[in-house]
Curated annotation (Swiss-Prot):
Signal peptide (residue range): 1-19
Domain of life, source organism: Eukaryota
The protein's name in its UniProt record: Acid phosphatase-like protein XcAP-2
Protein purpose: Probably modulates blood feeding of fleas on vertebrate species by binding and sequestering different mediators involved in the host response. Binds histamine. Binds leukotriene B4, leukotriene C4, leukotriene D4 and leukotriene E4. Does not bind serotonin, adrenaline, noradrenaline, ADP, and stable analogs of thromboxane A2: U-46619 and cTXA2.
Source species: Xenopsylla cheopis
Keyword Signal: yes
Disulphide bond pairs: 147-374, 168-220, 347-351
Amino acid sequence: MKTTILLLVVLTIVQLSKAKDNLQFVFVTAKGQDHQACNYPQGPKITNIEEPDSELTEDGKKEAYEFGQKLSSEYKSRLGVTKWDSAQNYWAIAAIEKRTKKATLITAGVIAKRQSVTSKTWSDEELQKTSFPALNDFFRFINPQHCPKYIKSILSKQNDINTILGKCEAALKTVKEHYPAVNKPQHTWLVYETFKRMKQQKASNLEWLTDDIMKQLQACSAEITWFAATNSDEWRKISGGLLLTDIFTDLDQITQGKPQPYAPGGANNKMSLFTVPQVLVISHLAVITPPGTKIGSKDVTAQNIYPEDGAYVNLELFKGDKEDWKVKIVYVKGKGEPQQTIALPGCPEKCPYNKFKQILQQYAISDDDHKKACGFPA
């Protein structure tokens, strides 16, 4: 009898060891690589270049191409792709021209074109292939004219804001001596990102901008942006809920064996790549990291989640032998940083899709409800 039981246990273990989750689809959300230092919307004037006119630097072009190569190396064989084809098995999209150029360069890296493409002048037709104007709705929440209720709600938390900015008070005092227009809470974050690029690009007259000042600005930037995106469930929903709804729509279709909406490859699509600004990476993270989420083995904090240049979030969708679907969230917070797994509360690293959706559903929102929550003008 004992022998029979032992044999059954061994057979069960063998069967479990044979069970395998097969990667079916990857949803990539990537922050931009290096571009010309510029002034960001809702920010003070620091340079002579506005954000929509800021071009990728040569380093940025190279980094975008290399990121495409990294994606291909990571996923081509795992997804069972023989040859990448934008009409069949991957979809690269962006919201504005600078990012369509980056998406095109990443695409070139994915399909292993020569690196000389980084100096190529792309045609309007080539750039249009990566354009997806509907992405602009995801930016609604940061526009004071389009989402006044959200902005007003944030500004009503003045005590919390003052506490955060008090941690970089000395740095801000020095910054204001050189740029008096830095006088709003969001300016701390926006000037940090501008100064970072100016230092990388060796701009002149920045001797006063010490490493200590940059460290203080970075810490405040991380806290103020994470606070604005996650201070309440409602804020999470407004900042990232539209994107989450879009992701659910795509994953629902894929798990039902149906075509991914709008993807050129339809049901054959294996990877979607969104190239987005930092603010959308933050809002995306806000709706996939509810309280209790772990990044690696640690609790999520403003500092360990803040996306620097080269950051990306991958949602990996797996299918098991029993037609069961699971999602794994992989995050890299910047160039040279290691991959980390984001684990939802009560879930293993590969979270059953139904549970994944159940946990995060509270943050999903329709376009009409988002407009109402924003106070979007009729």
